[in-house]
Design a protein with these regions (language model features):
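ABC ATP-binding cassette signature C-motif
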Residues: 1-271, 315, 322-561
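Alpha-helical segments in transporter systems
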Residues: 138, 287-290, 297, 318-324
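Intracellular alpha-helical coupling/juxtamembrane segments of multi-pass membrane proteins
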Residues: 258-291, 295-301, 305-312
């Protein structure tokens, strides 16, 4: 039987109930083939991460059975990896090739033993030592162990890991995830379980990871909100919907097409969700020139959106973003802007102008200056040189993602309601509980304490807080991290119909292709490019501008030869 037809594990009647008596997995029967590439999608709280933990053997409090064929190994990347804080980056990454490191250590011990007088004086011990040395040499040759340092360096470079001598204790959450992912990929397990693998990765690292997983011989099961990733890697989509696991053959675009047709058959009246799916499918089917035209049309439609009936817009959209005050001609302008910290120059001679109704996607590696740009806009930082001006009519809506001012003891409902059942939004009364439900906080979830929220729940709350501010310029810092695809789709539509500007830091190229009218690209070495067009338009522009000269790290190289 060919490997791609061999079932390596099955889930037999798997169910899971969490307090207070909420069933998130309901009687799931699934079989998984060796080599299959599976993307898991569903609302936050639908059981995606729980499913991975059950497969990984970390969650045993479920009903039913998970049956593995003998001899297969499982590797798991969790959302918040637990790493030894006392180890360095290199020491943790080396754990991914522990069998090879153990062989090298023993080989060194054997070589050192040749100097032992007891061995030198005993021909029998010398023969035994030479035989073991030859055995180890064969194993090391077979695994190309002599090039292990190059392999580790290649892997760490591909995923932009921090310097190899840095202690884990001083790393950010994003840096820890990259180190953990690097270690896992080097282990090369037969079954690779990935929980939001693209979070905290820049576009180049995501591209490398996609190519690596496309060629990965084993089974890959990934929970992700990144729809381009699902399109490029997945051969199957597993949708978790109200506890049921529904498999769909094909990538994300194929799922979108099949799902829309199925919903059309099941529903006589068009729901908001179905209409949202249909509009995304319409966008997917657009030719590139039609997408460009749509982006340009947004820039000239500010007055139309501003004067549109907000009640009708709210009824049409799953996430409705109310218009803020009318913007003047000057929104945000930078001329010859420069900013550095000590010897590190973030940008030099930065120039851009954000027009009314523009949506700027901000891209670039971590530490390049994206957060500093937000701080400049907020007036929390000053430039070293140049002119930076925020227009007088600008009202900024932004919530610090660190949530420093939020008490962990407060509930989601208390944070949004501020002690009142309804508040004014878009010129109308909005019920606080109804507003939260738009961000998939329903029922008991609204009473969850801030201190126990997951990453995805925190980001949804962050969005709800920011959009409630009724600003005319939205600053969204990584709004797509850990958020389910349904909420992302609704957010995209909300932004498309918003009469105002947005500055969105994101590594999600699908989101930027749908919403961005401009790209502000932090390209490294203090170079920043402001480009009118979507993310894909910018990528094409960059290829034409740079020709075949690409940074060495962009080119895909395998971890193993």
């Amino acid at each position: 039987m060919a490997d791609d037809k061999k079932i390596i594990f099955s889930m037999v009647g798997v169910s899971k109930v969490i307090p207070p008596q909420r069933q998130i997995l309901k009687n799931i029967y699934l079989s998984f083939f060796y080599g299959a590439k599976i993307g898991i999608i569903g609302l936050n709280g639908s059981g995606k991460s729980t499913l991975l933990k059950i497969i990984a053997g970390l969650d045993k409090s479920y009903q039913g059975n998970v049956v593995f064929s003998p001899g297969y190994t499982v590797g798991y990347l969790e959302q918040e990896p637990k790493l030894d804080p006392e180890k360095t980056v290199k020491e943790v990454v080396q754990e991914g090739v522990k069998p090879i490191m153990d062989l090298l250590a023993e080989y060194e011990e054997v070589n050192n033993a040749f100097c032992d007088p007891e061995v030198l004086e005993n021909p029998e011990k010398m023969d035994q030592l030479m035989a073991r040395q030859a055995e180890l040499q064969d194993k090391l040759d077979a695994t190309d162990a002599w090039n292990i340092d190059n392999k580790l360096e290649r892997a760490m470079d591909a995923l932009r890991c921090p310097p190899d001598d840095k202690k884990i204790a001083v790393l950010s959450g994003g840096e820890r995830r990259r180190v953990a992912l690097c270690r896992l990929l080097l282990q090369q397990p037969d079954i690779l379980l990935l929980d939001e693998p693209t979070n905290h990765l820049d576009a180049e690292s995501i591209d490398w990871l996609e190519q690596h997983l496309q060629q990965y011989p084993g089974t890959v099961i990934a929970v992700t909100h990144d729809r381009y990733f699902l399109d490029h890697v997945a051969g199957w989509i597993l949708e978790l919907d109200r506890g049921e696991g529904i498999p769909w053959k094909g990538n994300y675009t194929s799922w979108l097409d099949q799902k829309t047709k199925r919903m059309a058959q099941e529903e006589k009246q068009a729901s908001k969700r179905r209409k949202t799916l249909e509009r995304e499918l319409e966008w997917v089917r657009m030719a590139p020139k039609a997408r460009q035209a749509k982006g340009k049309a947004r820039l000239s439609s500010y007055d139309r959106l501003l004067n549109e009936d907000q009640k009708a817009r709210e009824e049409k959209l799953e996430i409705y973003i109310p218009n803020g005050p009318r913007l003047g001609n000057k929104v945000i302008e930078a001329k010859g802007l420069a900013k550095a910290y000590d010897d590190k120059v973030l940008f030099d001679d930065l120039n851009f102008m954000l027009p009314p109704n523009g949506i700027v996607g901000v891209i670039g590696p971590n530490g390049a200056g994206k957060t500093t740009l937000f701080r400049l806009i907020m007036g929390q930082e000053k430039q070293d040189r140049g002119e930076f001006e925020v227009g007088e009519t600008v009202k900024i809506a932004y919530v610090d993602q660190t949530h420093k001012d939020l008490s962990p003891e407060k509930s989601v409902y208390e944070v949004i309601s501020q002690g009142v059942e309804s508040f004014r939004m878009g010129g109308r009364d909005m019920n606080a509980r109804a507003y939260l439900s738009k961000f998939n906080f329903t029922g008991a979830d609204q009473e969850k304490k801030i201190g126990v929220l997951s990453g995805g729940e925190r980001n949804r709350l962050h969005l709800a807080m920011a959009l409630k501010e009724e600003g005319n310029v939205l600053l969204l810092d990584e709004p797509t991290n850990d958020i389910d695809v349904n909420t992302l789709r609704a957010l995209e539509e909300g932004l498309e119909n918003f009469a105002g500007c947005a500055v969105v830091v994101s590594h999600d190229s699908w989101v930027l292709d749908r919403i961005a009218t401009h790209i502000l690209a932090f390209e490294g070495d203090s170079k920043v490019t402001f480009y009118e067009g979507s993310y894909s338009d910018y990528e094409e522009f960059k290829k034409k501008r740079d020709g075949n000269v690409e940074p060495k790290r962009v080119r895909y190289r395998k971890l193993t030869d």
